[in-house]
């Protein structure tokens, strides 16, 4: 079974935080209550939750803030190839905290949040594009480096 912790890139985190503040109008503590950035765990086994008691320790030791299967695949490959990537998740439940996601509450959340999340994602991309010459990370590589040639 594959278990990977995928760290966030600081440059992306800062652009995301700035865009979220701009779109939501929230600052400081109010924004911190809504926005979490950090390391995400990804698995290659869809049934990892069935072994949660065994997996909980690994998740805690990785200091990850989330477990995600789909965007984790994109992030793992972006990190491996040192290609800039970003994932903005619209989280409507807290399965690791034992809360149940009810259909009505999830639908109401998605109606409110999906448009806002899309605007945050687009604002983040605009910010990164405008400041592309200031982006620097040892985790990134340019498109003229292998394997892109």
Can you say where each PLM-predicted feature lies in the sequence?
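Short amphipathic alpha-helical segments
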Residues: 8-12, 113
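Active-site-adjacent substrate-binding region
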Residues: 11-104, 108
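His/Asp/Glu-rich mid-to-C-terminal helical/loop segments that flank catalytic regions of hydrolases
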Residues: 95-149
